[in-house]
Amino acid sequence: MKGIKFYKLPNGKEPVKDWLLDLDKSLRVKIISRIELIYDDNFGDYKKLYSDLYELRFTLGKGYRIYYTIQNDVIVLLLNAGDKSKQSKDIELAKTYLNNIKDNKND
């Protein structure tokens, strides 16, 4: 991979980065360590949801997930998610963010 970047909303907020900063430090370190493994193409537990939308799954906390896409060999972290109860809503929001990238509204 060439790199990893955070999806940025038009208002400048970065959902995944903001979520990481709000986590307990020990949990944040574990999640960031896992994200860094992606540089070596070690995705660990992940699932392809659609042709260009993936779910990085964690066994930490409430079963956290990070939805991401790959654009030009760069991982774009779109959205974090907590538990399964709102998973379909989270996936729809991640798809919206992905469509924004595709439409060059936000990259």
For each feature predicted by the language model, list its residue ranges:
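Enriched for short, Lys/Arg-rich terminal
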Residues: 1-9, 17-18, 26-29, 43, ...
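Beta-strand-connecting loop/turn residues
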Residues: 12, 52-54, 73-74
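Amphipathic alpha-helical recognition patches that constitute DNA-binding helices
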Residues: 15, 19, 55
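A short, surface-exposed loop/turn module that caps and links secondary-structure elements
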Residues: 33-58
